[in-house]
């Protein structure tokens, strides 16, 4: 297989993959339900009012000793009704908690709004990203509540801050902000909820203590959910947000990492599975929210829809709290960016998969390895653009033996091209005899006809994984390179890098030997630089920088290989010009 065919295979695979992704996005947009546009959406503060479905309420289990949680059965068929106690004086006031990285608005039961203070919405703007929001059209919040068959539980607005005031802020010199809330039920039952924010951390600790000072046992279970009306993204290669996975993901030690896109949310009948030691999350480009329960407590993991809203929920653990006893359950709520270093500090198995390099484990592992190298280069170079350049250089050095083997195979094929032409002329239209004679020649001269293609196939997973690393890494968001490139996740404003990419591809074509190429292939080759140039004009500049550096190094390697095998680059250029 000559260099031309190898290049065409790679080029058309790239085009086909991008067109396939584009077609899928357009089809999804065309078939997307219009519920968000046609149905009335309740106010954001009412989103958590619904209690879990009665068919899926886990039965409470007795506590062996004070503070020990019960287990959660897979699915309970017990008819359950939550007896929510209304707030004593209307809805609870909204309280604002502020750390150095988060500003939260909550009512004790739901986090209604969450701003990421270190991530502005735009490069030149000052407004931070709002991950959770009370937006009327697309509300998105996180809720933690209690449900029970017979015992009283707090309803919407049931929790009240123990301390006076509605604004609490992490002070300078402090590393922890602790804000307790309490619900005082009838007959001496109360639930004390404590929110803990830490400096530099996006995981919020939420601890519940059920204190039973009544004369009768109290039973109930905690539920934690993420509820969202998904935003319909503008589709196309010009919008990096639409490249990334948007939907629910969850993890269990048994099944590993799983995911469900918003557009396919209920295609497989939702989710209803008991899991211990997992987590559940909603993902979007660069950011995510997740409920992370205690590693030793079982929960029922549920995906369902509530009108226009997609819901990801944990139900359980369940408790039976004897008189005079206390039960405790704790969970973490992550509201923040997909920052590799901070996610690793949480020490949660599988949570690194929210950085969705691929749904396939092997591609995700390759992507994680590439980012590890990229981040170490950044720590040395202090610039993500130069880190991309350095990563490409390292990859080309590592893959140089494969590139060398590919060129050697192609050079050997060119050497025997006249003999192949003679065989074709000798056997004419007898394809069977021609193929037999060709294989005998390959065997005699020790030529591997796949030698030019195999190295490329080995390299392709690496380059595809690197593509997703550059798309997914929030570290590159709004990061500058130099000069006119001030945001590696935005397109090149002056189209300089796409123009360089066209020039490099054209030069590579001229330097690629093409003996025996047919006219159709020649015409296809002439248009490939323009096709790729048009595609690269509107994708993130970080990706184009990768292609330019990779193409430039490939051009230099091509020139070097030609010289190494005793050929003259000028002769090849003149031959291709004819």
From Swiss-Prot:
UniProt signal peptide: none
GO cellular component assignments: plasma membrane
Domain of life of the native organism: Bacteria
Subcellular localization: Cell inner membrane
Keywords assigned by UniProt, alphabetized: Cell inner membrane, Cell membrane, Chaperone, Membrane, Protein transport, Transmembrane, Transmembrane helix, Transport
Membrane-crossing residue ranges in chain numbering: 6-26, 354-374, 380-400, 451-471, 495-515, 529-549
Membrane topology of this protein: Multi-pass membrane protein
CDD domains: 5TM_YidC_Alb3 (cd20070), EcYidC-like_peri (cd19961)
GO molecular function: membrane insertase activity
GO biological process: one example: protein insertion into membrane
HAMAP family, per the entry: YidC_type1
Function: Required for the insertion and/or proper folding and/or complex formation of integral membrane proteins into the membrane. Involved in integration of membrane proteins that insert both dependently and independently of the Sec translocase complex, as well as at least some lipoproteins. Aids folding of multispanning membrane proteins.
Subunit description: Interacts with the Sec translocase complex via SecD. Specifically interacts with transmembrane segments of nascent integral membrane proteins during membrane integration.
Family the entry assigns: Belongs to the OXA1/ALB3/YidC family. Type 1 subfamily.
NCBIfam families linked: PRK01318.1-3 (NF002352), yidC_nterm (TIGR03593), yidC_oxa1_cterm (TIGR03592)
Annotated protein name in UniProt: Membrane protein insertase YidC
């Amino acid at each position: 297989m000559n260099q031309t065919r190898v290049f065409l295979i790679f080029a058309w695979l790239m085009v086909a993959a991008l067109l396939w992704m584009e077609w899928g996005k357009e089809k999804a947009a065309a078939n997307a339900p219009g519920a968000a546009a046609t149905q009335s959406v309740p106010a954001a503060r009412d989103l958590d009012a619904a209690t879990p479905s009665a068919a899926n309420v886990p039965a409470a289990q007795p506590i062996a000793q004070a503070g020990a949680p019960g287990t959660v059965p897979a699915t309970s068929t017990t008819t359950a009704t939550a007896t929510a106690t209304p707030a004593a004086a209307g809805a609870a006031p909204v309280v604002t908690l502020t750390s150095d990285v988060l500003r939260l608005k909550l009512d004790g039961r739901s986090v209604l709004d969450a701003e990421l203070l270190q991530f502005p919405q735009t490069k030149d703007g000052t407004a931070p990203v709002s991950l959770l929001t009370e937006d009327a059209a697309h509300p998105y919040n996180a809720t933690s509540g209690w449900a029970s068959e017979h015992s009283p539980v707090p309803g919407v607005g049931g929790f009240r801050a123990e301390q006076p005031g509605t604004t609490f802020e992490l002070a300078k010199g402090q590393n922890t902000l602790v804000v307790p809330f309490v619900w005082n039920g009838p007959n001496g039952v109360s639930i004390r909820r404590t929110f803990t924010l830490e400096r530099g951390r996006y995981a919020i600790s939420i601890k519940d203590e059920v204190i039973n000072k009544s004369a009768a046992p109290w039973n109930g279970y905690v539920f934690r959910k993420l509820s969202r009306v998904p935003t319909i993204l503008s589709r196309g290669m010009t919008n990096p947000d639409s490249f990334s996975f948007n939907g629910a993901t969850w993890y269990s030690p048994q099944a590993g990492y799983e995911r469900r896109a918003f557009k396919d949310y209920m295609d497989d009948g939702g989710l209803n599975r008991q899991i211990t030691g997992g987590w559940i999350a909603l993902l979007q480009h660069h950011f995510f929210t997740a409920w992370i329960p205690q590693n030793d407590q079982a929960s029922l993991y549920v995906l369902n829809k509530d009108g226009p809203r997609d819901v990801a929920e944990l139900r359980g653990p369940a408790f039976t709290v004897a008189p005079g006893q206390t039960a405790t359950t704790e969970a973490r709520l992550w509201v923040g960016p997909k920052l590799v270093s901070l996610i690793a500090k949480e020490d949660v198995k599988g949570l690194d998969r929210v950085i969705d390099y691929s749904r396939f484990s092997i591609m995700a592992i390759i992507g994680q390895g590439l980012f590890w190298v990229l981040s170490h280069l950044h720590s040395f170079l202090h610039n993500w653009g130069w880190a991309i350049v350095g990563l490409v250089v390292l990859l080309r050095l590592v893959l140089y033996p494969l590139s060398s083997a590919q060129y050697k195979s192609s050079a050997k094929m060119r050497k025997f091209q006249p003999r192949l032409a003679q065989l074709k002329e000798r056997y004419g239209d007898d394809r069977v005899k021609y193929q037999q004679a060709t294989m005998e020649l390959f065997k005699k001269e020790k030529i591997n006809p796949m030698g030019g293609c195999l190295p490329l196939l080995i390299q392709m997973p690496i380059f595809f994984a690197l593509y997703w690393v550059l798309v997914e890494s929030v570290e590159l968001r709004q990061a500058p390179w130099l000069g006119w490139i001030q945001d590696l996740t935005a397109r090149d404003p002056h189209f300089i890098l796409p123009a360089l990419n066209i020039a490099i591809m054209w030069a590579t074509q001229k330097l690629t030997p093409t003996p025996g190429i047919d006219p159709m292939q020649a015409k296809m080759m002439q248009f490939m630089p323009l096709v790729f140039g048009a595609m690269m004009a509107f994708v993130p500049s970080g990706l184009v920088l990768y292609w330019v550096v990779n193409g430039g190094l490939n051009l230099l390697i091509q020139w070097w290989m030609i010289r190494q095998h005793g050929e003259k680059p000028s002769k090849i250029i003149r031959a291709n010009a004819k």
